[in-house]
UniProtKB/Swiss-Prot annotation:
The gene is Dleu7. Signal peptide: none annotated. This is Leukemia-associated protein 7 homolog. Residues 28-87 are annotated as: Disordered. Pfam families: DLEU7 (PF15760).
Length: 209
């Protein structure tokens, strides 16, 4: 029986990334809370931080290898969103008028959040049992990179760097899904076919940008 450890670790990193993005949505007034469609479902779901105050997200130092440019140290009293995730620092919720660019940014962020939620759900409910029955490759480093990109994204307010980080998160998430599909493609069982179909549906919701 194959060890589920790489898949479990990948899910853990993805959930930290998801919690960071959900907190970012909520602090900007863009999220509907843990029960929103973007929230992972199932008994293994780790809810986002319950106590929070309006603020900007900043990553902690020491996110681990692959952290891309996390700047600054957490200030006293920051709220940890998740272990290795981001901290919440005071920042006003009023971010100005809702321009077309901001609407597009909100839509792109929501797409990444929803797709990450669906990926975690598929991994927990479908891929976990399959990994125990028959081994398939899991590329853990991609999930670590995704987590670090999302943590760096949370440092940004708006502008070109935010857009670049959001696009990087989008592309990294697509890479994770594509590699899982490739890993499952040559496995013959009906369960693997169902899992591949679910992953392809996620991929369809992540068009090229």
């Amino acid at each position: 029986m194959a060890s589920p450890a790489p898949l479990v670790a990948s899910i853990s990193h993805q959930m930290v990334a998801l919690q960071t993005l959900q907190l970012l949505q909520q602090e900007w007034g863009w999220g509907d809370g843990p029960s929103a469609p973007g929230s992972p479902r199932g008994p293994d779901h780790v809810p986002i931080a319950q106590a929070r105050r309006p603020g900007q997200l900043r990553t902690r130092r020491g996110l681990g290898r692959g952290s891309i440019g996390a700047r600054g140290s957490p200030e006293a009293g920051g709220l940890r969103g998740a272990e290795g995730g981001a901290e919440l620092l005071p920042f006003p919720r009023d971010r100005g008028p809702c321009t077309l660019a901001r609407m597009a940014m909100r839509s792109a962020l929501a797409r990444v959040v929803d797709s990450t939620s669906e990926l975690v759900s598929v991994e927990q409910t479908l891929l976990g049992p399959l990994q125990q029955e028959r081994p398939f490759p899991v590329h853990l480093k991609d999930s670590v990179e995704f987590r670090n990109i999302c943590s760096h994204l949370a440092l940004q307010i708006e502008g070109q760097q935010f857009d670049r980080d959001l696009n990087a998160a989008h592309q990294c998430l697509k890479t994770i899904v594509k590699k899982l599909i490739q890993s499952l493609a040559n496995l013959p069982s009906d369960a693997h076919v169902v899992a591949c179909a679910s992953l392809r549906q996620i991929l369809q919701n992540l068009p090229d940008v």
